[in-house]
Amino acid sequence: MSRAKLEQLGLELPLFPTTSVGSFPKPDYLVRARADFVKGKVAAAHLRELERKATAFWIETQEKLGVDVLVDGEMYRGDMVAYFAERLPGFTEGGLVRAYGNRYYHKPIVTAEVSWPGPVTVDWWQFAQALTKKPVKGMLTGAYTIMDWSFNEHYPDRRSTAMALAAVIRKEVEALIAAGCKIIQIDEPALSVRPEELPIAIEAMEYTTKSLDAYFVTHACYGEFEHIYPGMLDLAVDNFDLEMSNSDLDLLEIFRRHPFTKDISFGVVDVHSHKMETREAVRRRVESALTILPKDKIWIDPDCGLKTRTVEEAIEKLRLCVEAAKSFRS
């Protein structure tokens, strides 16, 4: 059904479509400029010019590699939740909280009714899409994850916070669709953190995507999915983007016990390691997927965003994805 939906949207993709989860490493010149901007040494207009330059580089790079569905690389974003919290009325900035390793972010605080100020991602999607004839994914963070990664000082409970955010994210989805976006990824990395709250995440996603004309992807990672599977299949999306290689394909055994009914963006390279996989290792991962999953439901991509790798590493890991996909098509 999902491939039929893509065709209805005017998208003709090959078997084993290749894509990326969202983020790419920022070039050194942009890293320096972002730091200088915070210090007041770089004007906003100049920073935006450099962000556009870096975005164009990654669109061109993906095209040269032969990636099928592109991403803008998020050159203009830092943290995936803070980006939205900084732009949505109702949030204030909290103190620094460790995200993972030695990476920190200012944990947002919901202090008033959240609202939609107008599009906060559409201009960047339009810029990226204008650079290519291939489809570019719209990239959003889901309502449940924004709620879970924020403090709440306004709403009576976590569900009402998530649903208020779902109403806001839906407006952004509608704006992307109105601009011509046909594939929209709504990231929910917090999906498996509190298994007892899966119904909240499902309800929030249902509100976000219901009756809207797009192909929806969600990316979830870092979790123990056995606690929420197969219930998570009720999430109102067409495609789950899952971190498979970093978990040694453990999820495949869960799928063996209960069929996976969605399309899957199957992570075949580990984004947390500087080590480069061999072509043979990547092929074996795809072969393992094919023992359980139908070939017309498998997309191929990295495990997660590539922003923590070097530019060179990110390119090579993407190249491995594309080479694997092409080898299985033939």
Where are these regions (language model features)?
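Domain-level signal for soluble alpha/beta catalytic cores
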Residues: 1-330
